[in-house]
């Protein structure tokens, strides 16, 4: 297969995965946006975490809320727990990498805040501990997962929301995660500030 054929194949795989995910995920994304808007209207904030590409997604979500998405609007309170290398390496060195997010959540999280927890497998130990810490702090969890939801899915409470991408390929799951994040940002803006039609 030549390179351009491979590129077309990858584009088509991404399109197919998004098409399959659209109807499955729409109600979950809607519910997650409502949970987030309710938190923001009640003086809550968004915390987000993930590893690797999912850390990038956590930061992307946080920056869209803090700065802007596609319209001018006031900044919204959001903290990506993936950005402070001194804190992360300190916790990893003194305790364990599994606690790099949970310790931050125990310090920063308040009842009514929302944790956006991102893992393509749903099995990242530090994300699982982050969810447990969020529940201890009476936070609501929005989980972006893939495959079978992993250990994260079994930890979620009735008030939590799982957005599970119906795919098994990490790259395809990540692509849908980013689209879901953009949908969340759009829905948050429209619910808080009105539609821009």
Curated annotation (Swiss-Prot):
It is found in: Cytoplasm. Residues 36-197 form the SIS domain. One of its GO terms (molecular function) is D-sedoheptulose 7-phosphate isomerase activity. Pfam families: SIS_2 (PF13580). HAMAP family: GmhA. Homotetramer. This is Phosphoheptose isomerase. It comes from Pseudomonas fluorescens (strain Pf0-1).
């Amino acid at each position: 297969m030549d390179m351009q054929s491979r590129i077309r194949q990858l584009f088509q795989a991404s399109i197919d995965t998004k098409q399959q995910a659209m109807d499955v995920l729409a109600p979950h994304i809607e519910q997650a946006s409502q949970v987030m808007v309710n938190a923001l209207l009640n003086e809550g904030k968004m915390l987000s975490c993930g590893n690797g590409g999912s850390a990038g997604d956590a930061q992307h979500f946080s920056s869209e809320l803090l700065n802007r998405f596609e319209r001018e609007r006031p900044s919204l309170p959001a903290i990506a727990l993936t950005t402070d290398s001194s804190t992360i390496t300190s916790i990893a060195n003194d305790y364990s990498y599994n606690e790099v997010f949970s310790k931050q959540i125990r310090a920063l999280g308040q009842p009514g805040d929302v944790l956006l927890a991102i893992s393509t497998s749903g099995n990242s130990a530090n994300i699982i501990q982050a969810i447990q810490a969020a529940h201890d702090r009476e936070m609501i969890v929005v989980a972006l997962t893939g495959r079978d939801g992993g250990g994260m899915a079994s930890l979620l409470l009735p008030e939590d929301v799982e957005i599970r991408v119906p795919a098994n390929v990490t790259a395809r799951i990540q692509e849908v995660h980013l689209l879901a994040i953009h949908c969340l940002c759009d829905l948050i803006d429209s619910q808080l500030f009105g539609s821009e039609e």
